[in-house]
Amino acid sequence: MDAKFHKLIRLADTISMREMEKHAIEDLGIHGLVLMENAARSVADWLTENKLKNNPGARVVICCGKGNNGGDGFATARLLANRGYDIQVVDAGEVKKGDSRKNQLLWEKFGESTTFPDVNASLMIKEADVLIDAIFGIGIEQSIEGAYREWIEIFNSNKTALRVAVDIPSGVSTDESKILGVAAPVSYTHLTLPTKA
């Protein structure tokens, strides 16, 4: 291949991604909600343009964890619901804080969440046409066990849905590209920066 086609891409690890986010918030004065909204809009725009505009009746289920990745998921749900799509949210059911909590409360003004574990949540995940993984983002480094493991296994049981991860598939280490007990394999990963994983 001709050298002019080669492009050096710098890969971001967990520490550098957190430093960039901190710089944007603290040094540049960009509110965390704005960063979350931009991430969510990017996911919603991509899904609308590439997957949903030709299938407007698709059942979309967004699985939201307790951290910032879950906040991205709630914001994505709200944006897609505003566009008229059938959106269902499965929530980790744990208390959220900060911007994630604000996006959870905003979503609750537009739609309903089903808390996991719940029979309805499992059924929603298994019957979805599009599954969005917003459970864990870049922050997880320990093995996934307990209810979260069960949740990801149910997510994985739907073999026919289009599966999209926000930032990185849950259960994959950002820095080491290894699976942390269990992972959510996806068709597409939507991220703002290339990562080592």
State what each model feature region is:
Residues 2-12, 52-191:
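Glycine-rich phosphate/dinucleotide-binding loop and adjoining beta-alpha-beta core of small-molecule
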Residues 195-197:
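Single conserved hydrophobic/aromatic residue that forms the stacking wall/gate
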Residues 1-52:
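Positively charged, low-complexity intrinsically disordered leader regions
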